[in-house]
Amino acid sequence: MEFLKSFTTILFVMFLAMSALETVPMVRAQQCLDNLSNMQVCAPLVLPGAVNPAPNSNCCIALQATNKDCICNALRAATTFTTTCNLPSLDCGITI
């Protein structure tokens, strides 16, 4: 259950990270933002209390269409936000 809460937080921060990236060309940043926005169909699956946390076909299609670099870059950026915001570091039990 804690993993789902953490994953939901990561997804939210991913969207924020994509809008904050300044080093990526604008077209690429917009593509990543669009890709990650399409991943919203997966959000109900990772929220605390999700009845069936297995991905459905819509989630799988969105994940397949998403550039993997966009996901990884967003997660990397999100991990730096806690330091900048003077918050405890994220401990999600995943290694990126």
Swiss-Prot record:
Tissue/organ expression: Tapetum of anthers.
GO cellular component: extracellular region
SMART domains, per the entry: AAI
Protein's cellular compartments: Secreted
Cysteine pairs bridged by disulfides in the record: 32-70, 42-59, 60-85, 72-92
Signal peptide region: 1-29
Cross-referenced Pfam families: Tryp_alpha_amyl
Keywords for this protein: Disulfide bond, Secreted, Signal
Homology family: Belongs to the A9/FIL1 family.
Entry protein name: Tapetum-specific protein A9
